[in-house]
Amino acid sequence: MSSMRTHYCGLVTEQFSGQEVALTGWVQRRRDHGGVIFIDLRDREGLVQVVCDPDRPEMFKAAEEIRNEFCIRVTGKVRPRPAGTENANLTSGKIEVLCHELTVLNPSVTPPFQLDDDNLSETTRLTHRVLDLRRPQMQYNLRLRYKVAMEVRKFLDAQGFIDIETPMLGKSTPEGARDYLVPSRVNPGHFFALPQSPQIFKQMLMVSGFDRYYQITKCFRDEDLRADRQPEFTQIDCETSFLTEQEIRDLFEDMMRTVFKNAIDVDLDAKFPVMEFREAMARFGSDKPDLRVKLEFTELTEVMKDVDFKVFSGPANSDNGRVVGLRVPGGGAISRGEIDAYTQFVGIYGAKGLAWIKVNEVAKGRDGLQSPIVKNLHDAAIAEILKRTGAQDGDIIFFGADKAKVVNDSIGALRLKIGHSDFGKANGLFEDAWKPLWVVDFPMFEYDEEDARWVAMHHPFTSPKDEHLEYLETDPGKCLAKAYDMVLNGWEMGGGSVRIFRSDIQSKVFRALKINDEEARAKFGYLLDALQYGAPPHGGLAFGLDRIVTMMAGADSIRDVIAFPKTQRAQDLLTQAPSSVDEKQLRELHIRLRTAEPKPNA
């Protein structure tokens, strides 16, 4: 391999017995057993046991002085381990290396934690990320990330895609998430924006005739962070010309199947199921449903319109209200304390409470039910609830009644919490499997109550369905888009759409968004101009590489599959970024800081 080593530690196996090897790595552990020193030597491929015998005094003296995380080089002979001392958990577990020579390449100060400590806080791990990345799980995660990216490139290259870079410094378009702004020193008072996606550039590449484009690139969004969000993230960005929506979906479904098979030997469905946005929201309250959870909403809005219970009838008679039931088979065993905990949980999502009915005996109707709300419901409503939910003896039915968004968010989250719980898994409410699907036919627009206007659900370059073009000017709320998301186990793996390729339709969409011609020209004139030069029909997808690898690795957060991530406060604890800069730098950029005004006392 090199003049310093002949093999990786973790790849030395019994086939090398009797051979001389040179190994380099870090001391995982040093043990002194009856005058013989054992060293667990670690590199990126794993561990090997090195035996240091006192018969070689100079080498043995060096071995006595080493400590954890010293970087060393050893030479020695591979031999079988004595019978009964093999370690089946290691690739090298049947052999050991009898050390002939040991060199300390670099000592180490005492690490702030043991690398095999699984209870470290994330703050400690991110502050000492260099050491954290030495841990086997992190080594695995980042190598898996490389493998996924490599498999994506292999697939797309074979399909005739061309890897083209697009600019990192672009124009700010204050739509959607906030941009990260970069001041221009040579153009005082002007700013670049880091790209939220290469969306417009890849569309212009299609106009330029490149036909099939991709890049694996960084994108930036200055938004509030969650477990699956970072201010900078990596996107597998793809665009094609002259393909229909179905052909685009088929192509990238095949890509995802290939990547999962080659990267982690998982066979995804031969054909992903397809679900309309409307159906996903009706059944699961989410446009990215986790199909592993075997619980669904039951629509009860109509049933509750005439009940003498304002908690239900109020939302049922409201234009933007919704009432649903969530039947949990066997849920009668859920304790009152657990119900109280679930009530607190749905409150996180804006729910004002959590109504429930335990079904003791269906055949007895009202008398077979246990709940404080039964007295508020007439017999017809109770009968309809039991019928529609398919309730059986021993079940519990939870209810959501509020604005549709609150119901979808709160009962949707409750569905997942119960399904993923020990109770859910023990009662067959969760299937441990890979469950992909396409969600399609998204609305083009959603209404922003605060600004009293329509906003694009995806982005303003998404094409409306051909049969809905008339709604752009008459009723934008009815307009559906040629948009599609690939969902896997409740995570959006990628999303895309067929794009608008005619400038007249693009202008109509801008007008529906209350972006007048002058504003559209100022923000997107270069795209509108490009569309006039025979732009081809085109569309594509963008996949979140971080999310894909997180799912494959079974990691808790995308921060576990990124080498140097930011915290949920968008800070890098290793380098202490972001940081203040000196006055000279600000003057060169023609920037003066404005001190935040103190908030008045309430």
Curated annotation (Swiss-Prot):
It is found in: Cytoplasm. One of its GO terms (molecular function) is nucleic acid binding. The record marks H33, G84 as: Important for tRNA non-discrimination. ATP binds at R221, D222, E223, Q230, E492, G544, L545, D546, R547. CDD domains: AspRS_core (cd00777), EcAspRS_like_N (cd04317). Its main location: cytoplasm. Its EC number is 6.1.1.23. One of its GO terms (cellular component) is cytoplasm. It catalyses: tRNA(Asx) + L-aspartate + ATP = L-aspartyl-tRNA(Asx) + AMP + diphosphate. It comes from the Bacteria. Residues 199-202 are annotated as: Aspartate. One of its GO terms (biological process) is aspartyl-tRNA aminoacylation. SUPFAM superfamilies: Class II aaRS and biotin synthetases, GAD domain-like, Nucleic acid-binding proteins. Aspartyl-tRNA synthetase with relaxed tRNA specificity since it is able to aspartylate not only its cognate tRNA(Asp) but also tRNA(Asn). Reaction proceeds in two steps: L-aspartate is first activated by ATP to form Asp-AMP and then transferred to the acceptor end of tRNA(Asp/Asn). Homodimer. Belongs to the class-II aminoacyl-tRNA synthetase family. Type 1 subfamily. This is Aspartate--tRNA(Asp/Asn) ligase.
